[in-house]
Amino acid sequence: YTAGVIPSTQYPDNAYVAIYNGTNFNETPVIAKTDKIGYACGRMRSQYYQTIWAADNGDVYVFSPGYGRTAVSSSDLKKVTGQKPSGAMRIKAGATDFDPDYYVNFEEIGTKHPIFRCWHISEDYFLLQLYKKGAEDMINGGTSADVSELAVFKAEDQTIMPVTGLPADGKFGGEPYGEKGYAYMAVTVTTGEKPAFYKI
């Protein structure tokens, strides 16, 4: 930490997306902003995870774990603690701003748990890795929080389907592989069994 440098966002309850016209990153992008969700990224220690994905029709879905709530302020760091729950917003294909009619609060649907990571599977289906014990564990558990829950999110319908049939002590290794509408997730267990791929 360098004195005078703020080590965290001062806007934890806002999400910003830079939209470029074409493939030239030298151009000035249009910045889409929303205050319905917090900043969009997953995180484990110093590694940040992608949580912005496009559906097959070009609509872009922006997912937020609601990590602003984990920031603890102090007089020297001057962090800002967020309040927004885990959620998702949409930018329609070709648009340059968030869809005002689309908002999902993941802590009000399905198992009501915040997301840890997410991946596009096919069409408007996304695989979500969730905090199994809820928002309180995410906020207080840090890197020890239980993230062993999976669900499939159908974005257009705003519905979540829990993934069942996984080992009770299953942990997930890395990122899933997607092909032909299926996600293949590497799963490890603590019972001595060999790791295996599960088809979702």
Model-predicted segments: where are they?
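Long, acidic/polar, low-complexity amphipathic helices and coiled-coil-like
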Residues: Y1-A54
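Short, conserved, GDST-rich strand-edge loop motifs in beta-rich repeat architectures
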Residues: Y1-N14, V62-Q83, Q129-A145, V189-T190
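Beta-propeller blade signature
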Residues: S8-F25, S75-T96, G142-D157, F197-I200
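Beta-propeller fold detector
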Residues: F25-Y39, K92-G110, V152, T159-A168
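Membrane-embedded hairpin module used as a gating/binding unit in multi-pass transport
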Residues: I37, C41-A93
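Repeated scaffold domains used in trafficking and secretory/extracellular systems
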Residues: Y39-I52, E107-I121, A168-E179
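Short coil/turn segments that connect the beta-strands within blades of beta-propeller domains
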Residues: N57-D59, E123-Y125, K180-Y182
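C-terminal structured domain segments
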Residues: E149-L150, T159-I200
